[in-house]
């Protein structure tokens, strides 16, 4: 559902944000 999509987007956003702030891209 839409809630699941929001949850995934939020987690992805947090992960990207942490990588950008940390300056250490990890995938």
Swiss-Prot record:
Q: In which tissues is it expressed?
A: Expressed by the skin glands.
Which family does the UniProt entry place this protein in?
Belongs to the gastrin/cholecystokinin family.
Q: Which domain of life is it from?
A: Eukaryota
Key words, A-Z = Amphibian defense peptide, Antimicrobial, Secreted
| Protein name as catalogued | Caerulein precursor fragment R1
- Give yes or no: UniProt keyword tRNA-binding: no
Role this protein plays? Antimicrobial peptide.
Key word Secreted present: yes
Q: Where in the cell is it found?
A: Secreted
Q: Name one GO cellular component term.
A: extracellular region
A Gene Ontology BP annotation from the UniProt entry? defense response
């Amino acid at each position: 559902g839409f809630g699941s999509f929001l949850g995934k987007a939020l987690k992805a956003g947090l992960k990207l944000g942490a990588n950008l702030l940390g300056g250490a891209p990890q995938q």
